[in-house]
A protein has these predicted regions:
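Charge-dense, low-complexity intrinsically disordered segments
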Residues: 25, 29, 228, 328-335
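A transmembrane-helix-recognition feature enriched in membrane-embedded lipid enzymes
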Residues: 4-54, 88, 93, 116-123
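Soluble catalytic domains of membrane acyltransferases
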Residues: 48-303
Length: 406
């Protein structure tokens, strides 16, 4: 269930850079390809990388494209080089098409601290993040929404407001539009020719549905043994991508380890040495799990549609109401979905048989809230390697930082 204003904000965010310029995709692909090939060369030279079950990624991407859906991959976050490291280890067939190169999020304070870096990471298909309700998340929802799909059942006023280009296509139906616009959405689909025209109006150009890769923990986590390679809870921004896209993406869990050996968090104060190879010869493993059942995702989306119908704000019907943003029922639904996604990633970890079983407390947002607020005093048995970057005083460079991880 999508809201027109969310899609509109997403398009406005993407339009901040000239993504529709004829040269953009060429330069973007060159940027991505150069970075990924450089990473691939370095990792293969200094380390021992292994990618497991890549056929599951092949199947998920093929299924997504065949069913006109996006692909969403979710992975644990062990190192600042997880991306591009993870993507660079994939076979070359994933690197040669700009529409198959993943989109992703990047920390605003690291990736977008200067105009030059902002251009570089935008060309690299990375969006800057600060908070759960922000332009980059709206943009991700728009990216995950196929260009010829609409979901306006709750927007009968659509003709009276400024709309994203896709919504304008429905208005072109003129007198064909019934009072129930949702019926028009279900029965009137843009032709392939119309879709090409629509894509030229969008703030980015693509010929296939997209792939978005997310680290739902939000922050890198490196813990000392026996808690090593555990995860934080998953922030519910990831849930918005699944609940609010016009069509549910194919969701594929991924678990990795070994990237933390390349850049250990306790090398933070080593200056330039931090970015030199550490632990040369270490193994790096990326393992793909099974795609999450479509029925499970649809059950969550069904509950979301019920909440949208019940808590729509008549004053701003095309947008998320305060209740849909911050109400307990909406937060609980997003939290449940985020926890479910985490369980799927955790199942891959546990199935490896390499690490001690993860402590149940690590999936609890309340544990991490207390641990972070007290800067570790609430549970001194859990030891960080390096810093816990979720601590607010370490995030002063983000004036809009909020602890919104329910």
């Amino acid at each position: 269930m999508s809201h027109p204003d969310v899609l509109k904000r997403g398009e406005e965010f993407l339009a901040e850079y000239p993504r529709t310029a004829p040269w953009w995709n060429y330069v973007s692909h060159a940027t991505c390809f150069g970075m990924l090939m450089g990473s691939k060369a370095l990792i293969n030279l200094f380390y021992k990388p292994h990618v497991h079950n890549v056929e599951k990624l092949d199947f998920a991407l093929e299924k997504a494209r065949r069913e006109n859906r996006a692909l969403l991959t979710v992975m644990n976050h062990m190192s600042v080089v997880d991306d591009p490291g993870f993507f660079s280890l994939l076979p070359m067939r994933f690197l040669t098409d700009i529409d198959t190169v993943r989109w992703g999020f990047g920390a605003h304070n690291i990736c977008f601290s200067t105009p030059a870096l902002s251009w570089f990471f935008n060309l690299g298909k990375i969006l800057g993040t600060k908070r759960p309700f922000q332009g980059s998340v709206d943009a991700a929802i728009r990216i995950l929404s196929p260009d010829d799909t609409l979901d306006l059942e709750f927007s009968p006023w659509a003709k009276e407001v400024e709309k994203p280009s896709l919504i304008q296509e429905i208005n072109n139906l003129g007198s064909m539009v019934p009072e129930n616009l949702g019926l028009a959405v279900k029965t009137a689909k843009p032709s392939a020719e119309a879709t090409n025209i629509l894509m030229s109006k969008l703030p980015f150009i693509r010929t296939k549905t997209s792939w978005f890769h997310v680290f739902p923990e939000g922050f890198v986590l490196q813990l000392e043994e026996p808690e090593n390679n555990s995860m934080r809870y998953f922030k519910w921004g990831i849930s918005r991508l699944i609940l609010e896209s016009t069509r549910a993406p194919v969701v594929l869990p991924v678990y990795s380890y070994g990237f933390e050996k390349i850049v250990p968090e306790d090398s933070q104060s080593d200056g330039i040495k931090r970015w030199l190879p550490h632990n040369i010869g270490a193994e790096i493993h990326v393992t793909f799990g099974d795609a999450i059942a479509d029925e499970k995702l649809e059950n969550y989306r069904k509950e979301w549609r019920k909440l949208c119908a019940k808590y729509s704000d008549p004053k701003t019907p095309g947008d998320l109401s305060l209740e849909l943003k911050h109400g307990k029922k909406a937060q609980n639904l997003r939290s449940q979905l985020a926890a479910d996604l985490r369980d799927h990633v955790l199942a891959i970890r546990e199935g490896l048989g390499k690490f001690a079983p993860e402590k149940a407390k690590f999936k609890d947002p309340a544990f991490w809230h207390d641990y972070t607020v007290t800067e570790g005093a609430s549970d001194e048995s859990v030891k960080f390697i390096g810093k816990n970057w979720a601590i607010k005083r370490l995030q002063k460079h983000l004036p809009e930082y909020e602890d919104e991880g329910h």
